[in-house]
Amino acid sequence: LIDMDSNIIQKGKEKIFIPKASFTIISTLMDVPHKTVSRSALVFYLEQAYHHEILDNTLTVHIASIRRLLGDEYIKTHKTVGYFWDFDVFKVG
């Protein structure tokens, strides 16, 4: 369960606060589940959200951080292309 207003993801009984930039990545990937979003598109979305240049390595660091928080099974890598959210998404409320 994801609370889009407070950047909190509930995984089982655990509530996990997701930093804003990482949450931007998660919500972007969840908008098109099971479809690859290119690295360059994700960098673009982050740059638009934060109004400054984002280095490619910064994206890699955020993806690694998300995987540490949630587990490897949620975000998958499409090698040399980008990433995709590997779970079905249902919006409630």
Which residue ranges define each predicted feature?
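A conserved catalytic-core signature of glycosyltransferases
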Residues: 4, 32, 80
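Positively charged, aromatic-enriched patches within helix-turn-helix-type DNA-binding elements
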Residues: 13-18, 24-61, 68, 73
